[in-house]
Amino acid sequence: MVKKTLILLILLVSCSGSQTVVDEPSKSLNSEDVLNLIFDSYKNFSSNPEKAVDVIWGFAHEDNKEITGPKERFSQMLISEPYNSIIDLKEYSYEVTYENETNIHYEVKVLAKTNNYFVITWVFEKTECSDSEEQCWLTIAVTAPSYFESGI
């Protein structure tokens, strides 16, 4: 279960269509910025899958990379069930359910391309960025989708 949660967590991180590929997360981005980059990228995933994977991988915590990597394996995971449910999503909304100085949990409601709604919890940790002593927000966990009875 922990492995599946960590895997799902990593798959959900990406950037918007106008954003450049993120090789290293930026300390200037707050957790909400990162969450929006991720979900906007998922919304436009099919327009540039390689870029989305690069960004998702870039915002993943090192512990998650160890479990889901290498990046080529991770890329295949993203387009497989149940992880592909977020690809090309239509809309999303979110709220903070837990927050302290180093962790934040978001409950994210997603309208999938299939017109079904589901909720996931996305968890970030403020931690040392790789190749830097600066702090940045990285994905440490994502829950499996919990679907609603009906969509639109």
Model region roles, listed by residue range:
Residues 46, 66-67, 148-152:
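Short, solvent-exposed loop/turn elements at domain surfaces
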Residues 4-13:
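Sec-dependent N-terminal signal peptides
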Residues 28-47, 55, 59:
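Short, aromatic-enriched amphipathic alpha-helices that serve as compact interaction elements
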Residues 97-152:
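Exposed beta-sheet edge and beta->alpha loop/turn motif
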Residues 16-19:
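Bacterial signal peptide processing site
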Residues 49-101:
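Short solvent-exposed beta->alpha transition segments
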Residues 22-27:
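TPR-adjacent "capping" and linker segments in tetratricopeptide-repeat scaffold/adaptor proteins
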